[in-house]
Amino acid sequence: MTDISAVAGQPALVRNELNLVWLDMEMTGLDPDTDRIIEIAVVVTNSTLDIAVEGPVLAIHQSDETLAKMDDWNKNTHGRSGLIDRVRASSVTEADAAAQIAAFLARHVPPGKSPMCGNSICQDRRFMARWMPELERFFHYRNLDVSTLKELCRRWQPAIYKGFQKRAMHTALADIHESIDELKYYRERFLIPAAPAGETA
């Protein structure tokens, strides 16, 4: 676990019910009933996204038979990133990963308080409910989905929408940091408070 505070000398993250848990998973496909989780990572930030702590980044073992069922996009993407090799070499099961991550999260946020945060996070939540139900119960039932802001910005402020360029690395930890950066981008450029009544620029 690494403190990735943006400012040198910034205080460590204090356990707080307002802290946010950011999560990303890589899967063999899109159907939680037939596909499996192959990587999971978490990052906890404070409520203002100024302080962050990285949690476990885990490749989850799956059989060669399961990996062989992936479509070409998944085989190519996860092959290029090295994830398929990491999955084959891993001895971590879904239950192992869920236990490690729950133990890490409990040190930074009370159970049932943080929404699940990320991009298109409902998809991760579907897989977690299917394959890691005990970890899914750690989260509040709400989601904080950066994709909501993305879709609104795309329709209401297309110039701002085009200003954030994703790296599309498709590894769990990199995708989390990109989601946090994307939310900061929308906060600074899209979520602009209106001036109080009667106040002019």
Swiss-Prot record:
Q: Where in this chain does the record put each Exonuclease domain?
A: 20-183
GO terms classed as biological process: DNA metabolic process
Cellular localization per UniProt:
Cytoplasm
Enzyme Commission identifier(s): 3.1.15.-
Quote any Pfam family the record assigns.
RNase_T
Catalytic residues (positions): Y141
- Keywords attached to this entry: Cytoplasm, Exonuclease, Hydrolase, Nuclease
Family from the record: Belongs to the oligoribonuclease family.
Role description: 3'-to-5' exoribonuclease specific for small oligoribonucleotides.
Name this protein carries in UniProt? Oligoribonuclease
Please tell me the species this chain comes from: Burkholderia pseudomallei (strain K96243)
Upper taxonomic lineage: Bacteria, Pseudomonadati, Pseudomonadota, Betaproteobacteria, Burkholderiales
Q: Which gene encodes it?
A: orn
